[in-house]
Amino acid sequence: MRTGRMSRKTKETDIQLELNLDGTGIADVNTGIGFFDHMLTSFARHAEFDLKVRAEGDLYVDEHHLVEDTGIVLGKVLAEALGDMAGTARFGEARIPMDEALADVALDIGGRSYLVLKAEFASPQVGQFSTQLVKHFFETLASNAKITIHASVYGDNDHHKIEALFKAFAYAMKRAVKIEGKEVKSTKGTL
């Protein structure tokens, strides 16, 4: 099974995370930030990954450290679960609507970190979640998982736009990690 787990404790956060790429979409997430929990749960459900997250942090400061460190840990665990990536499809893409919002995500899990995100948010927050952290979360995740993500979203409702992004990311990841043979998808023979 393609799984990973990690515990990371700093002076700002304490995070335990488990991931199973060959799961059924079971999520058990508690970060103390309701909207972020909703996004991570949605990601797991739609990617059909099993995800368990326990995260505590200095939320009395703000949610930045907790969201950032969750991105670090999820990225590292994702890289661990992918292993040498032999047989994986490597590339994934998805286009997901949510009412008036439409998100597009294309990604490559081939070991190169990069993020391009085209998104604008009208509100500074959705619930207790700063909309500035959408880009930062995906940057941190991409860097630590060593994946390239191109994403864009438009719409009127910030909740819908962010949720459409997380769902599009989920479906793109689901396609990228799918086993399609035994070889590494690279002309180099390795990633």
From Swiss-Prot:
PROSITE patterns per the UniProt record, alphabetical: IGP_DEHYDRATASE_1, IGP_DEHYDRATASE_2
Pfam families named in the record: IGPD
A single BP term in Gene Ontology: L-histidine biosynthetic process
Gene Ontology MF: a single term: imidazoleglycerol-phosphate dehydratase activity
GO cellular component, one term: cytoplasm
Source species, domain of life: Archaea
Subcellular location: Cytoplasm
Pathway(s) served: Amino-acid biosynthesis; L-histidine biosynthesis; L-histidine from 5-phospho-alpha-D-ribose 1-diphosphate: step 6/9
EC number: 4.2.1.19
Keywords carried by this UniProt record: Amino-acid biosynthesis, Cytoplasm, Histidine biosynthesis, Lyase
InterPro entries in UniProt: IGPD_sf, ImidazoleglycerolP_deHydtase, ImidazoleglycerP_deHydtase_CS, Ribosomal_Su5_D2-typ_SF
Catalytic function, reaction form: D-erythro-1-(imidazol-4-yl)glycerol 3-phosphate = 3-(imidazol-4-yl)-2-oxopropyl phosphate + H2O
Similarity annotation: Belongs to the imidazoleglycerol-phosphate dehydratase family.
NCBIfam families in the cross-refs: PRK00951.2-1 (NF002111), PRK00951.2-4 (NF002114)
Protein name per Swiss-Prot or TrEMBL: Imidazoleglycerol-phosphate dehydratase
Species of provenance: Methanosarcina barkeri (strain Fusaro / DSM 804)
Taxonomic path: Archaea, Methanobacteriati, Methanobacteriota, Stenosarchaea group, Methanomicrobia
The encoding gene: hisB
